[in-house]
Structure formats: structure tokens, C-alpha cells
Amino acid sequence: MIETTTLRFSHGDTTVLDGVDFTAETGDVTVLFGRNGAGKSTLLRHFNGLLEPDAGTVSVGGTPIAYDDDSLTELRLRVGLIFQNPDDQLVAPTVQQDIAFGPRNAGIEDTDRIEDVVSTFDLSEQAERLCNTLSGGEKKRVSLAGVLAMDPEYVLLDEPTAGLDGAGCRTIVEFVSSLAADGITTVIATHDVGFGLTVADTVTVLEDGVIDYRGDTLSQSLAAEYDLRSYVFDDWSDVSVE
């Protein structure tokens, strides 16, 4: 479980999160909706200690986050974060090196797992390619593979479908479905309501730094009130809506 209690965070004079009480149940896919600037990405970055709150607590697995270097290193082995821009994720020259970077940096030498992850994301033929020669969709797959190679307990995704076409978005849906099948607690920040409702077990809407709605689905009329749109999956026939 990931949980926050009266979480507050400001950037300069601007209050970004204002007393947020949030829960992501163990094994669930929790989708965090909100328009641009609502505070979604800021909240997500608190879950693996990239940001420290001004007030309130963040707990992962029932334990409040400690912000010393050793504790944060251990936390980030358990909680993988996939950034919106895959270029922020890629840290090594080639595909294979990038996917293996996280485990090796943590002292984990598991060649079989790395090879399995490379194969899972259909990257075997591109393993020696330079990351800076990849397309946006290919970079996204490498960033997903790099996080999965860490064998995390929790996965956080920030706007994972941004800039992707339909095929790329389906890759993300399949990835999230595989996380759910493996019982990995997943939190996704997005303003793409079609994608979000396709994968969500539970839904939270963040509005102006506060949680404005919780539920297991979201009606189209309510989505419109929050200015949420479906950018790729125009047909909602397979999506549970009220």
C-alpha cells in the first residue's frame, strides 16, 4: 500500500498539494486523474522520495518514508518510477546497457532476468542500438524494461501514453495488465481518461492540489467537468463507465 496523510507541498509561494490524503491499495492499479497543473506529477514523485513534503507523511508498505540517502536508495529499489519523457530515464549508451544499469548499480547481477526483460519488450534485435537513435515509442519501451528489470514491488507511471500512437498506447496497456497480473501495486498519473479507465481498479481525481473524487470508475459527464479527454481510445465501449 502507498498512503499519504495530510500531505502538503509548495513550490515557492504556490501551494501545489494541500492536505492530500491518498491511498493506493496493495496489488491495485490506481489511476490519478487531473488536468494539467493539478499536482499529479508532484504527488507521484513523493511516492519514491524524489520530493519531500513540507508537512504530512508518505508511507510505503506501512512504513513512513525516511529521507536519508541509504533509506532512499533502498526505497527506489522497491518503487520504480517511469517519467513522462523517456529521455529523462535513459542513462546508458545502448539499449542493453540501459536496461541493466539499474540492477547493476544496485549490485544485482541477474543476466537471465535482464535477457528475459529484453525479450519481453521485443528489444532483442535492438539490444546494441544506441538509445539516442531510438524513436519515442522505442525509448518508452526501454524505460519500461529498465524499471521492470529492478523487479519492483511498486511501479509509478507519469503520463505514460503521452506522445504515443495507438500501438504505443496498447503496449502501455499490456504492460500495466502484466503488472496487475503479477500483483504489483501500480499508480498512474494521466489526464487521458480513455486509457486510465481501461486499466484502473480505482480512480482518484486531483483538482487544484486536493483530492476531489474517489471511486472505481468515472462517468463521462464527470470526466468532462474535470476537462479529461480520451486521446487515443475514442471508443469507450470496452471501458467501464457509469
Curated annotation (Swiss-Prot):
Keyword Acyltransferase included in the entry's annotation: no
Any one GO molecular-function label of the UniProt entry: ATP binding
Ranges annotated as spanning the membrane: none
Residues noted as binding ATP in the record, renumbered to the chain: G34, R35, N36, G37, A38, G39, K40, S41
GO terms classed as biological process: cobalt ion transport
Membrane topology: Peripheral membrane protein
Protein's organism: Halobacterium salinarum (strain ATCC 700922 / JCM 11081 / NRC-1) (Halobacterium halobium)
Xref: Gene3D superfamilies: P-loop containing nucleotide triphosphate hydrolases
Similarity comment text for this entry: Belongs to the ABC transporter superfamily.
One Pfam family recorded for the sequence: ABC_tran
Domain of life: Archaea
Cystine residue pairs: none
Protein name: Putative ABC transporter ATP-binding protein VNG_1631G
